[in-house]
């Protein structure tokens, strides 16, 4: 060994640590380039800052981060014109793992979830060592700005490194990776281009990838969200929107602002103009990208709640460390404040745009079911979300809102009535609506998959309770029906009791009702439990506690009047048929379809005198 080459040992645990970095992160090893580029960009920012007080540190006009693959030599070189390092800096900065949390890093990396491991290497200050995931030897040649000396640090990742004098024409750093046999992809300029766009597209430092001996720009270099709104054109907004989410439409809304004060961040968010191809029902996590100092960190920071997961875009802050695990992100107070602020801004935008009924309609038809989830997921914002909801109605065409419904309530009406079913078209002809329509009472018609859940969570709106009309205990007697109504037949009480006996445990009760006009029977739920739609969902899921429905009978219907006067021996078969009719009206099948078909056929034959 030359006398000018110094050999240093990392420390007893470093061999194990490097082994962990290389093997535990193998599937995510592309992040090595993110780490090296982030370090290079930071070095150039530091030099730019130092130049404010030292002319000797001024950056050259063409300063950039340069990524140069060499297929013949099988090397990848990342160069920068940054602040550079002295011999002592190299020993300290690239040797810190010997004395700064090696054991803690090793233990944390071993116990961390696979998806959190990539960010841990930066969190513990060992991001540089991710280079050994793709290289079996790494050399770093650096010259500190303001110094004439350059030094080369070299290691094979086996627990030791060397330092020796070197030459470098200008201040800055060259990191040369001697690539492993299975790392050929990082010799391809197109692959390097892709990684730069993925991880560092918007950092302000220019990044070039060398292709056929020429430097080609690989990043935009301008963070659009960092610009003032007045400096950005609609075309630029659209181009960025298309690039971040593979969108081909125009955004329905663009939100661009900068928060300043105790918490500082920039945000550029988009609400799409159409539903995405992938189902929002299957993917419930927000994918807004988190950047720290323009460097992409993750799109899994859950910057927005699941009920706003249709929003796309970027939030960039300097109030978070550049590298932090997702697990630690969730408990970071600064991130919690960012989430609250960003969520509030999106809700405020929706509130403003909801005043334009026609414009808001397209948003609602695309993302309404997702927004409804906020009612039962976000107690704090429930009151802000409720006025944004839109519904079909038994009384008006098109969409209506809860405030509009309340403004149309009849004198003496105390509740907001709604009906939930799977089929929007079936709702309009549901017998559940007959008594309400006949009395001029409006009912909201709900058919989204979330509608069985949120009304009970909201409870009230503007002091008015929300009531499912399929629940028992609704008293409509204060609202008179138009026209003269026939009296209930004699013997109706005995008939109802006989039907209840005949059906037994298949129903929880049988009773007369004033909610029907044209139909003979209808199902309802008990007043204290879940409504019919929730009971139906519980049965489909095999959950206990769904209970049995109540069979309500219209005593003024011709069929019921006739059955009430029929011999008692006919009640058991009639009771089963009435229950099947009610089930069919409610969107369910008869208990025994074949038996029901025979009953109907026999009744038709009898009616024809056959």
Curated annotation (Swiss-Prot):
Protein keywords: ATP-binding, Chaperone, Cytoplasm, Nucleotide-binding, Stress response
An annotated Gene Ontology molecular function = ATP-dependent protein folding chaperone
| Region feature C, mapped onto this chain | 537-610
UniProt xrefs under Gene3D superfamilies: 3.30.230.80, 3.40.50.11260, Heat shock protein 90, C-terminal domain (1.20.120.790), Histidine kinase-like ATPase, C-terminal domain (3.30.565.10)
Organism's domain of life? Bacteria
Gene Ontology, cellular component aspect: cytoplasm
Q: Which PROSITE patterns match?
A: HSP90
State the SUPFAM superfamilies in the record.
ATPase domain of HSP90 chaperone/DNA topoisomerase II/histidine kinase, HSP90 C-terminal domain, Ribosomal protein S5 domain 2-like
Protein location: Cytoplasm
Q: Where is this region: A?
A: 1-326
**Which is a Pfam family this sequence falls into?**
HSP90
Describe its partners and assembly state.
Homodimer.
Please give the family membership noted in the entry.
Answer: Belongs to the heat shock protein 90 family.
Please give the function described in this protein's UniProt entry: Molecular chaperone. Has ATPase activity.
State what protein this is by name. Chaperone protein HtpG
- Organism of derivation: Methylobacterium radiotolerans (strain ATCC 27329 / DSM 1819 / JCM 2831 / NBRC 15690 / NCIMB 10815 / 0-1)
């Amino acid at each position: 060994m030359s006398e000018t080459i110094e050999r240093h040992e990392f420390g007893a645990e470093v061999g194990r640590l490097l082994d962990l970095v290389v093997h535990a992160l193998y599937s995510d090893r592309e992040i090595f380039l993110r780490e090296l580029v982030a370090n290079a960009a930071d070095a150039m920012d530091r030099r730019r800052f130092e130049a404010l007080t030292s002319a000797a540190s001024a950056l050259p006009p063409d300063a950039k981060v340069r990524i140069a693959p060499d297929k013949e030599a099988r090397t990848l070189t990342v160069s920068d014109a940054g602040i550079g390092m002295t011999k002592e800096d190299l020993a300290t900065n690239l040797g810190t793992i010997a004395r700064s949390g090696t054991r803690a890093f090793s233990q944390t990396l071993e116990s961390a979830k696979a998806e959190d491991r990539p960010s841990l290497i930066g969190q513990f200050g060992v991001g540089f060592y991710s280079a050994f995931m793709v290289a079996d030897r790494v050399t770093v040649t650096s010259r500190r700005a303001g110094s004439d000396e350059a030094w080369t640090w070299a290691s094979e990742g086996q627990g030791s490194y060397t330092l020796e004098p070197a030459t470098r024409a200008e201040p800055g750093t060259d990191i040369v990776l001697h690539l492993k046999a299975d790392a050929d992809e990082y010799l391809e300029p197109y692959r390097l281009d892709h990684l730069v766009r993925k991880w560092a597209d918007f950092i302000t430092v220019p990044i070039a990838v060398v292709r056929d001996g020429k430097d080609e720009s690989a990043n935009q270099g301008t963070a659009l969200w960092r610009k003032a709104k007045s400096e950005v054109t609609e075309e630029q907004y659209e181009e960025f929107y298309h690039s971040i989410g593979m969108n081909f439409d125009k955004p329905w809304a663009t939100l661009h602002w900068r928060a300043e004060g105790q918490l500082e961040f920039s945000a550029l968010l988009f609400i799409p103009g159409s539903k995405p191809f992938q189902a929002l029902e299957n993917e419930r996590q927000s994918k807004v990208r988190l950047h720290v100092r323009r460097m992409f960190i993750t799109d899994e920071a859950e910057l927005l709640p699941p009920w706003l997961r249709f929003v796309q875009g970027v939030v960039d802050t300097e109030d978070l460390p550049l590298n932090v695990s997702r697990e630690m992100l969730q408990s970071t107070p600064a991130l919690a404040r960012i989430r609250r602020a960003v969520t509030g801004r999106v809700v405020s935008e929706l509130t403003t745009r909801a005043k334009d009924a026609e414009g808001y309609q397209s948003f609602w038809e695309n993302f309404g079911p997702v927004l409804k989830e906020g009612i039962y997921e976000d107690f704090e914002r429930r009151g802000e979300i409720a006025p944004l909801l839109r519904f079909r109605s038994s009384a008006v065409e098109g969409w209506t809102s809860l405030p509009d419904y309340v403004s149309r309530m009849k004198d003496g009406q105390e509740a907001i009535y709604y009906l939930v079913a799977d089929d929007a078209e079936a709702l309009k002809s549901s017998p559940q609506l007959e008594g309400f329509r006949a009395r001029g009472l409006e009912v909201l018609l709900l058919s989204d998959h979330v509608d069985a859940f949120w009304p009970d969570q909201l409870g009230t709106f503007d002091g008015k309770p929300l009531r499912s009309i399929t629940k028992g205990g609704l008293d409509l007697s204060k609202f008179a029906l138009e026209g003269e109504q026939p009296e209930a037949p004699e013997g109706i009480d005995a008939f109802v009791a006989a039907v209840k006996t005949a059906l037994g445990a298949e129903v929880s009760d049988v009773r007369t009702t004033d909610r029907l006009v044209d139909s003979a029977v209808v199902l309802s739920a008990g007043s204290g439990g879940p409504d019919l739609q929730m009971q139906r969902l519980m049965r489909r899921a095999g959950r206990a506690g769904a209970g049995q429905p109540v069979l309500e009978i219209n005593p003024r219907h011709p069929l019921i009047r006739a059955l009430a006067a029929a011999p008692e021996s006919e009640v058991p078969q009639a009771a089963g048929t009435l229950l099947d009719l009610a089930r069919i009206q409610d969107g369910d099948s008869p208990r025994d379809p074949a038996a029901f078909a025979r009953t109907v056929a026999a009744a038709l034959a009898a009616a024809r005198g056959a």
